[in-house]
């Protein structure tokens, strides 16, 4: 049996402001730093240790990983960063307040943009300052690989090849792996691992800063999964994520 731990980064500054973030490189909020620290403490208390870690190229995930590894006294382990683990690209919605967007377009439309599998938000133009092609961290990507917007399927289509080519062989080799990523890149991975339907993935929320453990068989098929937190805390934090797209705003 293998175990892999998935962790959504701690609350970011734009999570705090209830804004669509996507590939925008915002940092952790003070609460997010504390969530990351608590994740590290929880993993340490439960006896978890890691041989290597995978994360995105966005600082909210990278910093969460740094803090967790610091708590575990494992800052020396290899860390592999890939744009393929980035958050879903929210196109022209990036930077907009979710509650204000819900007022303008309706809560149902915002829920579809945020949660559906195959609907893309309005796209960026290539001359928009937010276009990732202007960012040096994506200099090695082809124009076709750089998104102007993404739905969840698009996100899955970049996450899963990285899982299959790089992360899965690492797990199969016997290494203990930690993946620190984002709400939608992790939703995509969970959909793949658990073979979830469109409706099931639309209702799935992954809370910030709570380790999610997957126990996998030798073929990396899930045996079971669980959060390292009590059910009430998980429920409360999932509801926070769900309520971000509502007209009431932050809740």
Curated annotation (Swiss-Prot):
Its EC number is 5.4.2.11. Pathway: Carbohydrate degradation; glycolysis; pyruvate from D-glyceraldehyde 3-phosphate: step 3/5. It is an enzyme of class 5 (isomerase). Substrate binds at residues 8-15, 21-22, 60, 87-90, 98, 114-115, 183-184. InterPro entries: His_Pase_superF_clade-1, His_PPase_superfam, PG/BPGM_mutase_AS, Phosphogly_mut1. The active site is at 9 (tele-phosphohistidine intermediate), 87 (proton donor/acceptor). The keyword Cell cycle does not apply. It catalyses: (2R)-2-phosphoglycerate = (2R)-3-phosphoglycerate. GO terms for molecular function: phosphoglycerate mutase activity. PROSITE patterns: PG_MUTASE (PS00175). Catalyzes the interconversion of 2-phosphoglycerate and 3-phosphoglycerate. PANTHER family: PHOSPHOGLYCERATE MUTASE. NCBIfam families: pgm_1, PRK14115.1. This is 2,3-bisphosphoglycerate-dependent phosphoglycerate mutase. It comes from Thermoanaerobacter pseudethanolicus (strain ATCC 33223 / 39E) (Clostridium thermohydrosulfuricum).
């Amino acid at each position: 049996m293998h175990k892999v731990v998935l962790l959504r980064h701690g609350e970011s500054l734009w999570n705090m402001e209830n804004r669509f973030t996507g590939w925008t490189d915002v940092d952790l909020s003070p609460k997010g730093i504390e969530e990351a620290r608590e994740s590290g403490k929880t993993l340490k208390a439960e006896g978890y240790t890691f041989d290597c870690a995978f994360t995105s190229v966005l600082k909210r995930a990278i910093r969460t990983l740094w803090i967790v590894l610091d708590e575990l006294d494992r800052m020396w382990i290899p860390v592999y960063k890939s744009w393929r683990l980035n958050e879903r690209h929210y196109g022209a919605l990036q930077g907009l307040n979710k509650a204000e967007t819900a007022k303008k377009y309706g809560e149902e439309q915002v829920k579809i943009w945020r949660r559906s599998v195959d609907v893309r938000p309005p796209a960026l133009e290539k001359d928009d300052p937010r276009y990732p092609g202007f960012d040096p961290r994506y200099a090695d990507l082809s124009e076709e690989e750089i998104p102007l917007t993404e739905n969840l399927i698009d996100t899955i289509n970049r996450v899963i090849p990285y899982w299959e080519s790089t992360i899965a062989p690492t797990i199969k080799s016997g290494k203990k792996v930690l993946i620190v990523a984002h709400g939608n890149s992790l939703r995509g991975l969970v959909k793949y691992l658990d073979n979830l339907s469109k409706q099931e993935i639309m209702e799935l929320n992954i809370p910030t800063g709570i380790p999610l453990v997957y126990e996998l068989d030798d073929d990396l098929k899930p045996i079971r999964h669980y959060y390292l937190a009590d059910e009430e805390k998980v429920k409360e934090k999932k509801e926070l994520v769900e309520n971000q797209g509502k007209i009431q705003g932050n809740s």
